[in-house]
Swiss-Prot record:
Record's protein name: Salivary endonuclease
Glycosylation sites: N37, N102, N351, N381
Known function: Hydrolyzes single-stranded and double-stranded DNA with little sequence specificity. Inhibits contact pathway of blood coagulation in the host by preventing activation of coagulation factor XII (F12) triggered by soluble DNA. Modestly up-regulates expression of CSF2, CXCL1 and CXCL8 in cultured human dermal microvascular endothelial cells. At higher doses promotes host neutrophil recruitment at the injection site in mouse model.
Organism per entry: Lutzomyia longipalpis (Sand fly)
Major subcellular location class: secreted
One annotated GO molecular function: toxin activity
Amino acid sequence: MHLQLNLCAILLSVLNGIQGAPKSINSKSCAISFPENVTAKKEPVYLKPSNDGSLSTPLQPSGPFVSLKIGESLAIFCPGDGKDVETITCNTNFDLASYSCNKSTSTDTIETEEVCGGSGKVYKVGFPLPSGNFHSIYQTCFDKKNLTPLYSIHILNGQAVGYHLKHTRGSFRTNGIYGKVNIDKLYKTQIEKFNKLFGPKQTFFRRPLNFLSRGHLSPEVDFTFRREQHATEMYINTAPQYQSINQGNWLRVENHVRDLAKVLQKDITVVTGILGILRLKSKKIEKEIYLGDDVIAVPAMFWKAVFDPQKQEAIVFVSSNNPHVKTFNPNCKDVCAQAGFGNDNLEYFSNYSIGLTICCKLEEFVKRNKIILPKEVNNKNYTKKLLKFPKTRNKEGDKKVVRKRAKGA
């Protein structure tokens, strides 16, 4: 396999007295340090052999280091390069040069025949494996008729939170799903559209904060590798969201979910969806808001359901997508305080200009809003227990949000 050599792409070295190496790693092993040692822009996929010998398990860190025992192997795979897989083995003379792919990061989108959400189909976003199987980074339930994602679902690795690789965001892609609709242009020309709809003096949509941004459903920072983060830059993984909310309480919700996964130190399942259509009143007439011509509806609310598969517990965060009103009705009782998200968040979650936000019990939210959950979490046991933040919580998500998203994120 002729992979482009890049000495700083990934450092795998024998841990003989390396400073800062965890004590749990044997001195006769090889280690990958995240994110410092994985710097290749044209990043390969790192695969660990499965029990049956097939290369069907993408590597995921279980902390700042991934260790290989002497004799263990790791495969370097470049989807779409059409080249063989390179197998590398950890040994006592381990001095491995790093590799990067010949082609830039790419992912595929596969439309399945599986119906979801009542009016959508399941789309898998990921890449093919050497085994012939397709590895899904996340899945989206997408309503192709109305060009609207109903929800996305992905796994958040709690042991990898905080060790994601730095990724420079690229352009959002349609992968041909939106047909002749130029969604990128619709976002860029939205102010002109709404000036025509409400008049040139309208105040519903104005920059720098009161405009519609591409609101991620499965957020890029929930993923470790650049290829995974790049995969989130799909329009089917976004819905129009006010920028003030996108970088306000919705970002705070995303931070809370990552904090929760980090404290639990295990995989959690995250389902993120939209609810209703935003209605704005002008001259006593309410109008439903669309980014396009009766397609790409602007949601009234965004919701994020978090599931602990081991304990079968769940919680739902719901945020208003209207920074102009002081109330909203998600049809469920606020249980933020009961779940451990209470007093610290009151100042922020009650601020309508950055997105009114509450926490809900799954059963109440799903039943009253007639939400059809994906089959992976459509288990009645989840409706019985509220997922709470442990008392030894990391309060990073409670602090004022200072991390800025990319422009138009």
